[in-house]
């Protein structure tokens, strides 16, 4: 039985067959394009999923490394950070190299400078300071020379100190005067010491001559009293005393002593 839809179906089939005769590649090409589009969509989806998986893996690795660093002792953290810094991508290192290789501004030639001269035999050193103003002065007057400062190191008990001395005739004259004064004071002190020593020696000689007693050592067995003209053996308990030591006023004294031997 024929229905109302059979006629249009037959018409459509006949049109397709007729078109397929003239355009044999048209229909399969449409089908291939649809398949290629489907395949492209699937590949894009696969790429997106693969990228997402990569990102997740990287994030998990970073989290694990951070946990290890937090749990590791402080001595090893520096080592891990050094390894991370060494494993920087070459692109970043190239950019840093480019930044470093940029042309730097030239140093101004008008800036001042200091020159140290250590060729002195006194142990000191000269300091030459030159700046913009001094350069202008030297250009204006060639006779003027840069300021020189002599600094001499003095090593004392408390520490090391530096004394600044300007090379001028006034300072040299004052230094010579000070040295002369110190030398004069030293000679005066030495002469006074010598005179005091000679006076002490003269006093000792006078006392020895007046007493006339010769002090013997303990190891010897006898000693003498020249005033009394008596020689004892051993050491007496008490020294005899004489009233007048002058030879004119001496009176003959007769005393009897007993010799004692120990």
From Swiss-Prot:
Modified residues (Phosphothreonine): 91
Residues bearing the modification Phosphoserine: 72, 85-87, 89, 145, 168, 235, 246
Known outcome of mutating residue 168 to A: Abrogated MPK3/MPK6-mediated phosphorylation and abnormal nuclear retention associated with impaired cortical polar accumulation. Reduced interaction with YDA and fails to induce polarization
InterPro entries: BASL
Tagged with keyword Nucleus: yes
Induction notes from the record: Induced by MUTE in stomatal-lineage cells.
Feature: compositional bias, Basic and acidic residues: 129-146, 190-200
Renumbered ranges of motif Nuclear localization signal 1: 50-57
PTM section of the record: Cortical localization of BASL requires phosphorylation mediated by MPK3 and MPK6. Phosphorylation promotes YDA binding. Phosphorylation status modulates subcellular mobility.
Cellular localization per UniProt: Cytoplasm; Nucleus; Cytoplasm, Cell cortex; Cell membrane
Membrane-topology annotation of the record: Peripheral membrane protein
Keywords recorded for this protein, A-Z: Cell cycle, Cell division, Cell membrane, Cytoplasm, Membrane, Nucleus, Phosphoprotein
Polar residues: compositionally biased ranges: 179-189
Mutant lacking the gene: phenotype: Clustered stomatal pattern distribution in seedlings characterized by excessive numbers of small epidermal cells, due to impaired meristemoid mother cell (MMC) asymmetric division. Abnormal non-polarized subcellular localization of POLAR and YDA in asymmetric dividing cells.
GO CC entries: cell cortex; extrinsic component of plasma membrane; nucleus
Chain's role: Regulates asymmetric cell division (ACD), especially in stomatal-lineage cells, probably by modulating accumulation and subcellular polarization of POLAR and SPCH. Mediates an attenuation of MAPK signaling upon polarization of POLAR and ASK7/BIN2 in stomatal lineage ground cells (SLGCs) undergoing ACD, and relieves BIN2 inhibition of SPCH in the nucleus. When phosphorylated, functions as a scaffold and recruits the MAPKKK YODA, MPK3 and MPK6 to spatially reorganize the MAPK signaling pathway at the cortex of cells undergoing ACD.
Protein name as catalogued: Protein BREAKING OF ASYMMETRY IN THE STOMATAL LINEAGE
Organism: Arabidopsis thaliana
Protein's gene: BASL
């Amino acid at each position: 039985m024929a229905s109302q839809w059979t006629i249009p179906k037959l018409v459509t089939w006949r049109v397709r067959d007729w078109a397929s005769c003239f355009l044999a590649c048209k229909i399969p090409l449409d089908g291939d394009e649809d398949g290629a589009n489907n395949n492209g969509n699937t590949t894009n989806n696969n790429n997106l999923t693969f990228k997402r998986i990569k990102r997740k893996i990287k994030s998990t690795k970073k989290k694990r490394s951070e946990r290890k660093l937090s749990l590791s002792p402080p001595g090893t953290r520096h080592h891990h950070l050094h390894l991370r810094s060494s494993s920087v991508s070459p692109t970043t290192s190239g950019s840093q190299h480019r930044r470093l290789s940029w042309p730097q501004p030239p140093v101004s030639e008008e800036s001042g400078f200091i020159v140290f001269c250590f060729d002195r035999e006194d142990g000191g050193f000269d300091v030459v300071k030159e700046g913009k103003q001094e350069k202008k002065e030297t250009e204006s007057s060639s006779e003027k020379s840069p300021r020189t400062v002599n600094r001499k190191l003095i090593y004392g008990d408390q520490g090391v100190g530096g004394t600044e001395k300007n090379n001028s005739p006034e300072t040299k004259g004052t230094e010579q005067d000070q040295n002369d004064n110190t030398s004069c004071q030293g000679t005066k002190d030495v002469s006074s010491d010598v005179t005091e020593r000679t006076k002490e020696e003269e006093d000792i000689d006078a006392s020895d001559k007046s007493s006339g007693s010769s002090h013997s050592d303990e190891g010897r067995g006898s000693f003498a009293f020249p005033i009394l003209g008596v020689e004892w053996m051993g050491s007496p308990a008490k020294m005899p005393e004489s009233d007048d030591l002058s030879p004119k006023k001496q009176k003959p004294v007769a005393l009897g002593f007993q010799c004692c031997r120990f």
